[in-house]
Amino acid sequence: MLQICCKNNNISKNFPIGSSLLDIYNGFNLDIPYGPVSAKVNNKVEGLNYRAYNNKDVEFLNILNPSGMRTYVRSLCFILCKAVEDLYPDGKIMLEHPVSKGYYCALQIGRETGLDDVSRIKQRMKEIVEANIPFHRFECHTTEVVELFRRKGMMDKVRLLETSGELYSYYYTLEDTIDYYYGSLLPSTGYIRKFDIVKYYDGLLLRVPNRQNPEILEEVVKQEKMLEVFKEHRRWNQILGVGTVGDFNVACNEGYATDLINVSEALQEKKISNIADKIYHRGKNGQRVKLVLISGPSSSGKTTFSKRLSIQLMANGLKPYPISLDNYFVDREKTPKDEKGDYDYESLYALDLEFFNKQLQDLLHGKEVELPRFNFTTGRREFKGDKLKIDDNMILILEGIHALNPELTPHIPAENKYKIYVSALTTILLDNHNYIPTTDNRLLRRIIRDYKYRGYSAEETIRRWPSVRAGEEKWIFPYQENADAMFNSALLFELAIMKDYAIPILRNVPNNKPEYSEAYRLRKFLEYFASVQDKELPPTSLLREFLGGSSFRY
């Protein structure tokens, strides 16, 4: 017998050696709403078919938990892939990226995807769910798994596994359909309760349950500009021949890492230059831009972007001047509080909007103003003779999480503003059926930066991340489509460079801490990438903001 300590109810019970997590769940007589879908076993996420052979701590997860939702979505993706294989034996589906609170998929069947195709796929998916077919996981020597995928023509998975360096690899089956997924799946298709698939521009959108209320599906949010950014970068990846991590690893092994760095950096600089040109030429057309507003989520590289944009604006004969929103906080005792009673510095209303807008209007009308400095020790605004008056060629650069919120600058005419949204939108795929979450990219950047510059451990950064994400959902993401331009700060090669920085930091998270499961997941994910050294990374690279070695001052 073995002893299982269930963290859901803090009760320990004995079970036969080799019991599955599903057996253990039933043995505890638990009733978890919207679950279970997976479990943490000694703080590592496992599927419900996992069998225990030693004493374990187990915490069962539902789809309200991010790890549980990932298990649900992966399983739903496999069902979609099987439906496409059943209906279009010569077709192919690519699960490309999250957008509009769902997942954008490209269906390749030799013609344009029609509404009838979507209807057939949805019906076949429903049939698969209703049949309650089990997902099976097999582990074999990597050479055997590679040969299995090679015979199926799934070369994206062949390249991924061949470059993984692993002696053994696993794969999943759903009846006669085989696939590879990074992470656990549900025990069977019948665990899927809600989903939808709809036509979305020239592809499909896989809709999933709402993260807070799984009884309903996530609302489809229009993100046309965001989708176009993803597609533009996917096109460049395909031109470079590195659409997936396997492709990237092969290119690195053949000595092309430096070329990929140089081309990726050049593409970003070209994009920044184009944005600066648009700002300049709008002024030539009689709608002079006086205020550039830059917003984006945490660790998106807003600061370096604003510095590089300023250089390109200067190359157009303009004089950029940075304005920090941090200097416009209300006095500390006037700061709004969150539901826990703590000061909510991320709230728009933590800023003195009336005073900020008055100073902006005065500046734009040619008046001289004395700029404030916020003293974070006293929690008060101070004035120290820092005066500013803008001339005809001067342009104000305002960077902050609220920059695209219409409430921030309601009195500034739209023609005088140019709004830019910056985010790290990962466009390389693990393989054709495994996208890389954009939040993972930003979290890894933040873990490295916090450790290097702020003295925070990975454990602390991971612990705070959910509250950071909640602030983004409330204050940033609703306004991203307001942007005049979107800039993707993610670099094709950056996860391969961050690998050697992040893994040692992540290893420091003790396995008895709740944050270990996320640290372990990120570590295993990074191990798919070939390591690339940062010696070829230019000092102006956006990635230098997080790794160090930048020629900019922060």
Predicted regions and their residues:
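Hydrophobic anchor at the beta1->P-loop junction of P-loop NTPases
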Residues: 292-294
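Short, contiguous acidic and Ser/Thr-rich linear segments
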Residues: 9-19
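Conserved NTP phosphate-binding and transfer environment spanning the P-loop NTPase/kinase superfamily
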Residues: 283, 410-554
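Auxiliary tRNA-acceptor-end handling modules of aminoacyl-tRNA synthetases
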Residues: 50-53, 57-69, 83, 92-270, ...
